[in-house]
Amino acid sequence: MNTLRMRRTVLAVTAAAVLPVALAACSSDDGGKEKASDSGSSSAPKGSTSKSMDPMAGPFGPACSTVPKEGKGSFDGMAQDPVATAASNNPALSTLVSAVKKAGLVDTLNNAENITVFAPTNDAFDKLPKDQLNKVMNDKEMLTKILTYHVVGQKLTPQQLENGSYPTLEKSKLTTSGSGTSYKVNDVSNVVCGNVPTANATVYIVDNVLMPTK
């Protein structure tokens, strides 16, 4: 009897010692799973963050820093208006806007759908000899020809500028080349602020006026 009682006592003590260890092991396993799950879920957004930081997803180029940060002339403001109206709110494009008005192209540009406009800056127009600029600005037919040469009838992404040739509204073609954030039009005009969205167009601001070949 004493022997039997002793065996029962030993078994009880052993069970009391083993049970907490087993419970602790289970608890540790669950915690490890939770930590693994937490680390997995926390790493998920990293891919989307890097994607949203793609520099080609928005406007690019050295002259973009001169665009107003707020108001209708800002990138957000321009995106709400059709292209001629959007350009009129950008101080760096005032000469272009004046030319568009003289040529009677405001409604044409504002009512067009899914176009690309290569928009010369004020400095680009200033590069033209003064007598030539005055002549062009006072010749509606010539002015219309030049301005419509800056418009392509489809929205172009930066990638499509890498090695492109596109018919313009003027009918003749212009060429584009480059990569990354550096592009040229007709090998003579640099894109200084590109991929600017408006309500109906994508705008690439350029540093030279483009001239039709014919």
Question: What label would you give each PLM region?
Answer:
Residues 2-214:
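Mature, structured domains of secreted/extracytosolic soluble proteins
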